């Protein structure tokens, strides 16, 4: 068991570096946390954690490697991800041109908020799942760092670690941007912030679409 611990630490270190590098997940969670309530950012962080765990599971099962070899399917996911990011970014840019408008509707009734939390979770998961770079990342991780024929518990521990790291990091980002002080600043500068976040997401989507 002990000789598997350094491998888990290596995986954790590589994944931590990937997590703290700003990308679509980061910008999406940042905007939802700023525009909505604290719970919406946390729900989107949970969605990203779900998506990360799904990609890692597919890589463990070998599906991610197969996916990379089927050009039309891989490119289909890449284009779908690019369209999703561009669509989300355009919504933000459009909202930034409208006084008092955000892409998250803050409603007071508990059933509506439950629906908003589900939509935030779904947005986080789809943002992660439609990014084929996640497929390439986890395929390379399992090809280079995973031991040959590890015990079953190793897979379980690795998946749990990946999920907890993802939710922990993005949950912290959500909480940081959902504080009252940050919210007050966002309300003053909502339009330029939404415009910048939207433009960044559109740019990331365009870059993803242009990649071969």
Each model region followed by its residue ranges:
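Selected transmembrane alpha-helices and immediately adjacent juxtamembrane segments
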Residues: 116-117, 124, 128-133
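Membrane helix-loop-helix hairpins that form the core translocation module of multi-pass transporters
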Residues: 39-119
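Alpha-helical transmembrane segments and their lipid-water interface positions
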Residues: 25, 51, 55-63, 85-91, ...
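Juxtamembrane transmembrane-helix termini in multi-pass membrane transport proteins
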Residues: 2-75, 140-157, 161
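Hydrophobic alpha-helical transmembrane segments in multi-pass integral membrane proteins
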Residues: 58-60, 130, 135, 139, ...
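Short alpha-helical transmembrane interface motifs in multi-pass membrane proteins
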Residues: 9-14, 86, 122-126, 157, ...
């Amino acid at each position: 068991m002990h000789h598997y611990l350094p491998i888990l630490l290596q995986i954790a270190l590589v994944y931590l570096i990937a997590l703290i590098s700003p990308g679509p997940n980061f910008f999406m969670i940042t905007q939802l946390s700023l525009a909505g309530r604290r719970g919406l950012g946390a729900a989107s962080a949970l969605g990203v954690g779900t998506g990360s765990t799904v990609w890692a599971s597919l890589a463990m099962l070998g599906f991610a490697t197969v996916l990379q070899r089927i050009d039309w399917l891989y490119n289909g996911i890449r284009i779908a991800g690019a369209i999703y990011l561009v669509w989300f970014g355009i919504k933000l840019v459009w909202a930034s041109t409208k006084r008092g408008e955000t892409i998250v509707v803050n409603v007071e009734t508990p059933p509506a908020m439950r629906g908003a939390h589900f939509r935030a979770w779904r947005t986080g998961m789809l943002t992660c799942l439609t990014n084929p770079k996640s497929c390439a990342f986890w395929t390379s991780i399992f090809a280079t760092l995973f031991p040959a024929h590890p015990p079953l518990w190793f897979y379980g521990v690795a998946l749990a670690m990946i999920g907890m790291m993802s939710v922990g990091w993005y949950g912290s980002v959500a909480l940081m941007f959902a504080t009252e002080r940050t919210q007050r600043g966002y309300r003053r500068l909502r339009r330029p912030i939404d415009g910048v976040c939207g433009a960044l997401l559109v740019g990331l989507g365009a870059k993803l679409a242009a990649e071969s």
